[in-house]
Amino acid sequence: MIEAAVFRGLDRRRVLAKGERIEDHVVKAADVALGKAGLEPVDIDRLYGYITVPEYLTPNSLYHVHHLLGLPPEVMVVPINSEYSNFLLGVVHAAEAVEAGRTRNSLVACGANWTGHMDYTKGHAVSIGDAAGAAVVGPSDRFVVVDHLTRTASSQYHGLTMTMRTLHLNGLTLLPTDPVTGLPTPTYDMTQTGIEDLGGLIKDAVPVVALDLLKRNDVDPNQVTLLTHQGSRILMDHWNERIKPREYLDTLAEHGNMTLATYPVNLAYYLDEITTEYTLIVAVACGLHVTALLLRN
């Protein structure tokens, strides 16, 4: 499969300016989420999520977000490295902690700065956009976690990766470096197998996982607003046709593929426009896996 045949539907994307850091945007998103929930940093028990690509291999920059937000030292920081399902898994774990009586309010925050970590000789690179989003998870009668479902194809572990690698252009071999530090920096790669997985395994797995989750909970697709990974209009049109939700909301043309930030950003973007009984969020992720989260609105 040729990349150009897959990555269509993009009009614009957002890119961090020189000197901007994604952590600052994550903090802004978290502040908005706290404000909408009527909470202060002192009301938060745990911070879930992930910042990618982080400043260090470890610790994750989510710890720096903890500092910038002024969260109390008692707040547990839980980085979840599962691109791009980090937000969904954070919501799942946060909700389970609430149900178990271990916490009352958790913050789930994600940020992606991938535009600075792409190989722009590859077709998929121009679809990537930088973004940040956050949500508060606590006792509420809105957007209640109903159920979740995951399918993992770990045999495809090598297909989608972020690591240090040399790039090849016009007969030259280059090692990408960070413009600030001058040190080698990781870049994202989608192998030919990974591209074929998009047009095959992932293309088919998203509707299967989505419909299996709905069936398990006796929910009709017509009761659902759908949010998914947004990297290709062709794939999204296929998922819409197969799942047949009441509404299918995205911001691909406006924001591009925001990787792990896609889900909190789009949920916030359309929050006041969702009128269906349920919201279904389906994440495509490295590893390789597909995760679906069902919320009762």
Feature locations, PLM:
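Conserved beta-strand-centric core segments of catalytic alpha/beta enzyme folds
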Residues: 1, 28, 88-161, 264-297
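N-terminal amphipathic/basic leader segments beginning at the initiator methionine
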Residues: 1-15
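Acidic-glycine-rich active-site phosphate/pyrophosphate-binding loop
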Residues: 2-6, 56-70, 108-112, 180-181, ...
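Glycine/charged-rich beta-loop-alpha catalytic/anionic-binding loops adjacent to active sites
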Residues: 12, 44-48, 69-80, 116-119, ...
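Conserved beta-ketoacyl condensing-enzyme motif
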Residues: 19-84, 88, 216-236
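Hydrophobic pocket-lining "lid/loop/helix" segments that shape and contact the acyl-thioester
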Residues: 24-34, 125-252
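Claisen-condensing/thiolase-fold acyl-transfer catalytic domains that form or cleave C-C bonds
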Residues: 27, 53-54, 72-74, 81-102, ...
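Generic recognition of short, well-ordered alpha-helical segments
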Residues: 60-63, 120, 262
